[in-house]
């Protein structure tokens, strides 16, 4: 047993990969050879507006983008990817989709399906989906927030802090082991 917990046979890592992406009009993207060949801008003027305002992040999703997101969700569910959350991100034309947590090996495969589905469905909406981590200089890039956890086969979340110092021992031990592993490897 692990620090007084019930016997467990194995631990199960789970992941929820939040995929960020940019959407641009296909007709405009086709006017840029750098976007066509590199999937990002390589030259050009700085963005006309900084990111100091949160009007995009907290703004309403535009109708065209909302239709795209709706179709992406339908296609992902057909593939068995339980996508549920989508929203604007910080930079103009930047968005995010977040599938539901699942076992790590399945989540990685599903993220590949998510990226392919985003690109395919974007084309049907006259959009170009850009997954490059830094497609535009001077604005936020597109990352992949990798939320993860470790759960025993008994359903105990090993990364959940306890309410008392005694209940917190397991969490602190697991956290110390993770930190040591990251430092060593």
Question: Where does each model-flagged region fall?
Answer:
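Short, small-residue-biased leader/transition segments that mark boundaries at the very start
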Residues: 2-9
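Conserved beta-strand and immediately adjacent loop positions that scaffold enzyme active sites
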Residues: 6, 20, 147
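Flexible, glycine/charged-enriched surface loops at secondary-structure junctions
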Residues: 10-15, 83-87, 128-132, 185
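Short, conserved secondary-structure transition motifs
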Residues: 13-28, 98-100, 137-142
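Short glycine-enriched loops at secondary-structure junctions
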Residues: 27, 82, 86-91
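Acidic, glycine-rich low-complexity/disordered segments
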Residues: 31-32, 38, 73-84
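Loop-rich catalytic cores of soluble enzymes, especially ATP-dependent carboxylate-amine ligases
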Residues: 35-70, 90-91, 95-108, 112-116, ...
